[in-house]
Every structure is written in structure tokens, then in C-alpha cells.
Design a protein with these regions (language model features):
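Electrostatic, structured charged patches in enzyme active sites and in nucleic-acid/phosphate-binding
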Residues: 1-153
Length: 153
């Protein structure tokens, strides 16, 4: 049974047991999901015949944080290798709510803790995504950000 985090009622955590562990690149007995979205994607990747291999938070992409100027590690949600006709294609996929794909609306009169948190997260996420795009370009991969709309939610 997934554990529920009451700070965010939409957050769940648990272990995913793949039906096809040979497809998982990493330790298939140690696959952790941190949301129901991740669990849904894991199940889909595991069952999809066109998915040759996949992993969850196994890749490390260094990025420079705009908040402190230091290099940090970014662990994208998924890496996927897919058969597309005679060729294979690799993707790095991040799951995010659609509202996190646009910058926070500036309101100089209201600089609440929540607003400042959103600004920091927006800056941090953009740095991660820029690093992921550069990484993917070098490795002939594609970086995708999936939202609830992409997942049919």
C-alpha cells in the first residue's frame, strides 16, 4: 500500500515491481516511485512492447544552480529506449504539473514565502532542463517534459 504524504495529498511513495524486470536498466528490485504519475508511467513503460529498456532516476546530469552558482546533480524521472521502426530512439523524461512549466507571475506588492519558493523552483528547474537538453543533444537523445495532459489525467 502506498504511503501518503499529508503535506501534499497528491504525493505517494512506494516500490514498483516490474512484470518484465529484464527491461529495467538498473536494479529492478529497487524501483521507487514518488507520485502516482510516476507509478502510472512505470507501469506503461514496463508493458509497452516498443519500450526496449527503461530506468527511473538512474541517470545523473550535472547542472549549475542559479541560486548558489554551484554544480548539483539532476536525476531525471525516466530514461527510455524505444523501438521506432527499424531504429531505436532514447528519451529522458521529466514529469511536472503543467503549472510548473510557466514562470511565476510577478507581483512586486506580494512577495510571500510561497511566491519566493516558486521563483527559486522555477530557476532551479530551468537550469536542470537546460542541462538535460544539452546532455541529450550530445548523446543523440531527446528531452521531454510530460504533464498531466500527456498522461491523460
Amino acid at each position: 500500500m502506498p504511503k501518503r504524504n499529508f503535506k501534499n495529498k497528491m504525493t505517494y511513495k512506494g516500490r514498483f515491481a516490474p512484470e518484465r524486470p529484464q527491461k529495467y536498466k538498473g536494479n529492478p528490485r529497487n524501483i521507487v516511485y514518488r507520485s502516482m504519475w510516476e507509478r502510472k508511467v512505470m507501469s506503461s513503460l514496463d508493458r509497452n512492447e516498443n519500450v526496449l529498456e527503461w530506468s527511473s532516476e538512474e541517470y545523473i546530469i550535472p547542472y549549475k544552480s542559479p541560486l548558489d552558482g554551484k554544480t548539483h546533480r539532476y536525476y531525471p524521472d525516466f530514461w527510455v529506449k524505444v523501438q521506432q521502426g527499424p531504429k531505436t530512439k532514447q528519451f529522458i523524461i521529466e514529469l511536472k504539473p503543467s503549472k510548473q512549466l510557466t514562470p511565476p507571475k510577478a507581483n512586486p506588492k506580494r512577495r510571500t514565502k510561497g511566491y519566493l519558493y516558486e521563483v527559486r523552483e522555477w530557476g532551479r528547474n530551468n537550469a536542470k532542463w537546460d542541462a538535460a537538453k544539452q546532455y541529450c543533444a550530445k548523446k543523440d537523445m531527446e528531452f521531454l517534459i510530460w504533464t498531466e495532459k500527456d498522461l491523460g489525467l
